Design a protein with these regions (language model features):
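Conserved non-catalytic scaffold segment of RNase H-like nuclease domains
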Residues: 1-88, 98-101, 110-124
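Short helix/strand-capping connector loops at secondary-structure junctions
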Residues: 161-174
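Conserved small/polar residues in nucleotide/adenosyl-binding loops
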Residues: 178-180
Length: 180
């Protein structure tokens, strides 16, 4: 699943589907995600949605938690399906978190706790819930807070700050978050 952010705000343009893994669900996967063989048996196979997925992420910066792991699985499935591999710009939030908090746990749950992000709906690892949490973690990792603007102060310094912040908010940044 993926969610799209524009200017770090969710657009509600999401990509989500359940997939038939074409093999028996392992005990670990069942415990982690909660999806049974029976539930997944009638779902599409990855090769059937690969083109839609690639179209969705085309030209977008991808924010991924533990990108090496997710990309290895995604690219393996794309290779099997005979599709191009992902070559988007990637931002790995695990790398960002390790740089910011060396020696600390940087799991998604640990980062949610560190930033006081409510993850109580995350009983299982589900793609869209994880993407939503990751978007909030990512924004915190960037230290993106609301700009401090004083609209009553017309000093040249404050006017320049206003111009800078306005131009920042005019930028259109399209990001997708991927979670397998």
């Amino acid at each position: 699943g993926c969610i799209e952010l524009e200017n770090l705000v969710p657009t509600n343009n999401n990509f989500h589907c359940y997939l038939n893994p074409e093999r028996k669900v392992s005990e670990k996967a069942l415990e982690t995600h909660g999806y049974t063989d029976e539930f997944l048996s009638d779902k599409k196979k990855f090769k059937e949605i690969a083109d839609d997925f690639l179209l969705y992420i085309k030209g977008k910066k991808l924010i991924i938690h533990n990108a090496e792991f997710d990309l290895s699985h995604l690219n393996n499935e794309l290779k099997i399906a005979g599709k191009d591999l992902i070559n988007n710009e990637i931002i790995d939030t695990v790398v960002l978190a390790r740089d910011k908090f060396p020696g600390s746990s940087n799991s998604l749950d640990a980062l949610c706790k560190r930033y006081r992000i409510d993850n109580s709906k995350r009983e299982k690892h589900t793609a869209l819930i994880d993407c939503d949490l990751l978007s909030k973690v990512y924004i915190n990792l960037l230290d993106q807070k609301e700009p401090k603007l004083n609209f009553n102060n017309e000093t040249s310094e404050n006017i320049q700050m206003l111009k800078t912040n306005i131009s920042y908010f005019k930028k259109v940044i399209k990001l997708s978050l991927i979670h397998i």
